[in-house]
Design a protein with these regions (language model features):
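A C-terminal functional module that forms or caps the active site or interfaces directly
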Residues: 223-291
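Anionic-ligand binding region
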Residues: 195-220
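N- or domain-start disorder-to-order transition segments that initiate the globular core
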Residues: 1-20
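General beta-strand structural signal in soluble alpha/beta enzymes
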Residues: 24-26, 58-63, 105, 123-128, ...
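Glycine-rich nucleotide/cofactor/substrate-binding loop typically near the N-terminus or early
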Residues: 28, 33-35, 41-98, 220-236, ...
Length: 309
């Protein structure tokens, strides 16, 4: 397959990959659907700055004019931020049609993993992954992110699954598909806005070097698939569990009442939760992304050292 037929790798990113330097992939749904302009652009550029500050090259991933992009320019990030929700969220099923039509697409965890892997990027920082939605035993609403983690060899650094989901069933699904769930400095799965969920992770790992080694060995053994690193939100930005859980329950009920389902569910719930918490949930969301970018960069640095030895 000729990847350059579909894929544009930003020169700085291509040079870093060719030289075995650390690179961290970033998604673009957080820009288009995560928050309003200009806050979305400022946040995206700040995440890139944090990755550089911690020794890696950032590669924000998106689809622009039917081209898969691994690494965006500031102008492209600005374009994405201004268009916002007018850009379609793109999952695995959407890639071929968007490329065939020459359209734009905002990459989710799934599509960011796919394009990162095509480009040769091993580490990806995001806010939280999708998972098994509440009530999925009747709706079958399960995020494609989980299937991608099972099949695509990229390490995903996140703050746990979004707490709007059924976390127990999400962990069961990942276990069935052989995806290791690692807690960074914790034995408990973080729940995005809060540091605790009541569910155990598979392993606790306490350093970026050990994270890198575990992922390197997994690849070396030919096991395939990704690895999920869950990094708790910093204590000072963690939300009160009662407050956030009440907001989540209200938002879930409202989504049901309005008949919202499928890929519209998560943006609706996050926007509703933001309203119900007076914007506190968005502030927490931004800080946990910064925190994950820092850990992903440090881990990518260690991974590049292992690859060179």
């Amino acid at each position: 397959m000729q990847l350059n037929k579909f894929l544009d790798v930003k020169p700085e990113v291509a040079e870093a990959i060719a030289a075995g330097k650390p690179v961290v992939a970033l998604e673009s749904t957080i820009i288009s659907h995560g928050m309003p302009y200009p806050q979305n652009v400022q946040t995206a550029l700040e995440v890139e700055r944090i990755i550089r500050e911690n020794g890696a090259v950032p590669a924000t991933i998106a689809i622009i004019g039917g081209r898969l992009k691994a690494g965006l320019t500031e102008e492209e990030i600005e374009y994405f931020g201004k268009k916002g929700t007018a850009i379609a969220k793109a999952s695995r099923r959407d890639l071929a049609v968007l490329c065939a039509r020459g359209e734009d697409g905002a990459t989710t965890v799934t599509t960011t993993m796919i394009i990162a892997h095509m480009a040769g990027i091993k580490v990806f920082a995001t806010g939280g992954i999708g998972g098994v939605h509440r009530g999925a035993e009747t709706t079958m609403d399960i995020s494609a992110d989980l299937e991608e983690l099972a099949s695509t060899p990229v390490m995903v650094v996140c703050a746990g699954a979004k707490s709007i989901l059924d976390l127990g069933l999400t962990l069961e699904y990942l276990e069935t598909h052989g995806v290791p769930v690692i807690g960074y400095g914790t034995r408990e799965l973080p729940a995005f806005y809060t540091r605790k969920s009541g569910f155990a992770v598979d392993y606790e790992i306490d350093t970026p070097a050990e994270l890198a080694k575990a992922f390197y060995v997994k690849q070396d053994m030919g096991l395939g698939g990704g690895m999920l690193v869950t990094n708790p939100i910093p204590e000072e930005y963690s939300m009160d569990a009662d407050v956030i859980n009440k907001a989540i329950d209200e938002a879930v009920e409202e989504a049901k009442a309005q008949g919202i389902h499928g890929k519209e569910t998560t943006p609706f719930l996050l926007a509703k939760i933001k309203d119900l918490t007076g914007g506190d949930s968005l502030a927490s969301n931004i800080q946990l992304v910064y925190n994950n970018a820092k850990l992903a960069a440090a881990t990518a640095v260690e991974l590049s050292k292992l690859a060179k030895n």
